[in-house]
Every structure is written in C-alpha cells, then in structure tokens.
Amino acid sequence: MTTIAAVRKDGVTALAGDGQVTLGEKVIMKGNAQKVRRIYHDQVVIGFAGGVADAFTLQDWFEKKLEHYAGNLRRSAVALAQDWRKDPTLQKLEAMMIVMDEHDLLLVSGSGEVIDPDEDVVAIGSGGNFAQAAAIAMLRHAPDMTPADIAKEAVNIAGNIDIFTNHNVIVESF
C-alpha cells in the first residue's frame, strides 16, 4: 500500500512516491522505502505500488524489455503488458507501475493494460485517488506550481488521508 503520483506540465514530468511499507494492514515495517527510481541508464523513471516482491519482479521484467527494445518506453510497456496477460507467474503479481521518460507517461496495470492519461496526471496505490484529485486541482488552479511540487504535494495530501501512505516523499523529474 502506498501512493505514487505523476504530473506532466509544460513539457516537464515529475513522479513522486511515499516511503511506507506495511506488513498486512496493521504494522508499518519501513518508512523510507524507495518506490520511485531511475532505471535504464537513468533515462526512465518508474514508481510502483503493491507487494514489494511483486514490484521488484515487475521492475526486473520491465528492465529486460527496455534492454530488448533499446529504451523505447511505450514498446517496452506494451510488451510487458502482453507478457503479463499471458504468463501465469506474472498474472499472480499484485502490483502496478507508473513509467515515464522524457516523452511518455504511462500507467501499466495489473490486468495488463497500458494507459496514457488524458489529464496529464496519473496516480496509483491505496492513496492514488486522493493524490490524483489533488494533483488535477493543483494543475488547473495553481499555475505557478511546478510538476515536481504538484506531485509531491499530491502524495502528501494523500498521506493525510490514507493510513498506508507517509510523508517521506521521493520525487524524480524529466
């Protein structure tokens, strides 16, 4: 359980995520996990929500796709989604990812879908709906805020509401 939020504005994209890892639904195991990270020669940023082991498995599969498709984010995401739908091991994974590079911002869902958001905002995890609503409002009504500021504040707002999200927020931008 976590909150990951991405915002694209004026050619800049930012991805923010909190650091809380919860065991079951009662115990906070860690508060400073890094769920947003740069991969593929620092050219791609991913953020993941769901089971930790499942998220790492997805990251590994996605990195292999990026290597195979020479860093083409969209093609790699679609190939991962196709495998996700077909592979019995991947079908059991309980995780989602937001992936981005300088050109694309995509949600890769647990059902094997690749979604390019309409609103230039996408959020996942237990606090995802709170963060997405907050980010859309800031994007529309706070013109002086940067994408990084909006993404971070959206995760912090979710952290005020969602017990599975904390305020130890990491942000990466392109």
Swiss-Prot record:
One term of GO molecular function: metal ion binding
Superkingdom, natural source: Bacteria
EC number(s) recorded for this UniProt protein: 3.4.25.2
Cellular location(s): Cytoplasm
Active site residues per record: 2
InterPro entries: ATP-dep_Prtase_HsIV_su, Ntn_hydrolases_N, Proteasome_sua/b, Proteasome_suB-type
Any one cellular-component term (Gene Ontology): proteasome core complex
Positions that bind Na(+): 159, 162, 165
Catalyzed reactions per annotation: ATP-dependent cleavage of peptide bonds with broad specificity
Activity control summary: Allosterically activated by HslU binding.
Keyword presence, Protease: yes
PROSITE patterns recorded: PROTEASOME_BETA_2 (PS51476)
UniProt keywords, alphabetically: Allosteric enzyme, Cytoplasm, Hydrolase, Metal-binding, Protease, Sodium, Threonine protease
One GO-annotated biological process of the protein: proteolysis involved in protein catabolic process
Predominant location category: cytoplasm
Family: Belongs to the peptidase T1B family. HslV subfamily.
Subunit: A double ring-shaped homohexamer of HslV is capped on each side by a ring-shaped HslU homohexamer. The assembly of the HslU/HslV complex is dependent on binding of ATP.
Function per UniProt: Protease subunit of a proteasome-like degradation complex believed to be a general protein degrading machinery.
Stated name of the protein: ATP-dependent protease subunit HslV
Top-level taxonomy: Bacteria, Bacillati, Bacillota, Bacilli, Lactobacillales
